[in-house]
């Protein structure tokens, strides 16, 4: 467990109550990932690896050759890299500076991933009905109010093709 937490200002515990008090969404998300090491989250234990592998196996049931995937809240790119290396066209959107840096560090010229730093509430850079598969595994955890959650889901629906699939993760 300790590998996926970074030490910040001498503490190794995330203070969720303090983070929750930050009203500005971008600041709250950035502060969270300054502390939390998203780059190793899905690999830090056997249980985490099972979560990742179970998720991708389920998604693969719905993929067809040539599908375009949008990974909203892509983190450090675990799902984006997996699907891009399987030959799918992947676009990744991520808000947190730390995750963008970790993602870019792993990105090679062979990786066909369009990585953009941006907010899940604003997918205006993407045309309507432009993706076969939309992954929404992170942003809903961070959005505090129902209106923002609904906007995020509406944007995901807007960019998903008719007959496409949207995969959500939310607690």
Please annotate each region the language model reported.
Residues 4, 10-63, 66-73, 78, 82:
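Conserved class I S-adenosyl-L-methionine
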